[in-house]
Amino acid sequence: MIEVKNITKSFDGRVVLKDISTTFEDGKTNLIIGRSGSGKTVMIKNIIGLMKPDTGQILYDGRDLITMNKHELNMLRREMGMLFQGSALFDSMTVMENVMFPLDMFSKDSTKERRKRAEFCLERVNLSEAGHLYPSEISGGMMKRAAIARAISLNPKYLFCDEPNSGLDPKTSLLIDDLIHDITVEYNMTTVINTHDMNSVMNIGDNIISKLKENLMVCC
């Protein structure tokens, strides 16, 4: 569970987030909804520790991210999976190599076990036959699924997605929505998604909108 308590963030005197409080539950698909410029990217950057709020607390199962030292923050980030806007795959790597990248960086398992885990993740997103291909050789939807496989490769406790449907057609967007939602439930992750797509709210938002702050809504 992630608890956001009364966070405020300003830039050059302009308040972007003002006294935001909400809770993101385990096993739920939690949505941060807003138009461009509403503050949703700033909010998620604060939640994952890339920015520090001016005031407030961000608690991960009771642990305050804001007061963590560098080592504690690095350990917490190893529990996070990230799905960026676009796919953010490495063009010079195959799909399999992209999925194995975080495993090679952080996993202490043997090479055989790391590859087995990557193969499992690709199978989970229905890309078993695409591991040898490069990003330039697959569709946008397949790249997004490959990015999801990479994001879950380390079996994260928390999954953060920034506009996961960006650039996708409606049919593919629905498939990506369903995949993220199913994986969230399957692994009991705390998933937080930035989106301006109200179709995603209807497709995968687990709970009603519980907080409204100016142009920013949190569905959790």
Predicted regions and their residues:
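Conserved ABC ATPase signature
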Residues: 134-138, 142
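Short coil-to-helix segment of the ABC ATPase nucleotide-binding domain corresponding to the Q-loop/switch region
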Residues: 93-101
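Helix-to-loop junction immediately C-terminal to a conserved catalytic motif
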Residues: 48
